[in-house]
Amino acid sequence: MIYQRLMLVVCLVLLPLPIFAADDGYGYPIPGSYEATIIGTPAKLMPEFPANIPSRKLVLDVMPGRQKPAIFFYDEGLHSTFAYQKQKAPLVFLIAGAGASDRSAKLMTMMKALYQAGFHVITLPSPSNANFIISASQSKVTGDMTEDAADLYRAMEVAWKQVKGEIEVSSFNLCGYSLGGSQAAFVAKLDEERRVFNFRKVLMINPPVSLYSSVVSIEALLEQIPGGAKKQGVFFNKMLSKFSQYYRYGNFVAINDDFLYSIYKEKLFTREEAAGLIGLT
């Protein structure tokens, strides 16, 4: 079980977007593009954030009266996280990347950064997240940017209605990363028409310029697997064996950034294997 968890954690930290590649032009300490994508930001370059901030979970009834299949009995509403300042401050809505929840690691990091900068923050899951599909998607089939934007906008309105009596807001802002970055643009366009928030600033972090091109690029990484994409199972088992053996015989107490950086220094996988791992995620 520990080995399955090990491989899962390693795969989860692999961002499937090679545009995060390191560039020698600005002195990034990890020269390889695939390696930089896998390892992420080195600890020494990470800013310090407060360990705890005033925040609470929101459960939003975005689609009142919606009849959910019995199998989703556990889903009580759309999950959202609300971080708040004591004083009047701008509010920013954060949209998660593809499939991510309202409390994904990246979203929590962004929430703390924005809180530290003086913002109220409300995080929202990706429209492709199961909780969003069940509780907030009008069509229950996500992927159409215009429809997803309308669903997100509706969720934002419900979230704001729930918290507006608790905080003072000086302006509304919007931010999304990855697929959420593209969706932020569509939400901003919708807000120009509806004028509920009149977003002061909209930040798109690493949005795909072309979703089709991004998917094609990711699939191309799979072709670097020995034997091609059809050998994914064999490749996965081989990588799992490598990672688990390294973890077993190494002096590690946790599967964390230090573990990943150690793998990088030991050159545990080839460039082609790194590309295949990114493509698999």
Please provide the spans of the model-predicted regions:
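Bacterial N-terminal signal peptides
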Residues: 8-18
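Alpha/beta-hydrolase-fold enzymes
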Residues: 190-281
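Gly/Ala-rich beta-loop-alpha elbow adjacent to hydrolase catalytic centers
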Residues: 176-180, 184
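Glycine-rich "HGGG/HGxG" loop immediately N-terminal to the catalytic nucleophile
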Residues: 128-140, 183-185
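Short, surface-exposed "cap/lid" segments of acyl-processing enzymes
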Residues: 83-130
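Alpha/beta-hydrolase active-site loop
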Residues: 141-164
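N-terminal cap/lid segment of alpha/beta-hydrolase-fold proteins
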Residues: 24, 28-87
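Short beta-strand immediately N-terminal to the catalytic nucleophile in serine-hydrolase-like folds
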Residues: 174-176, 205
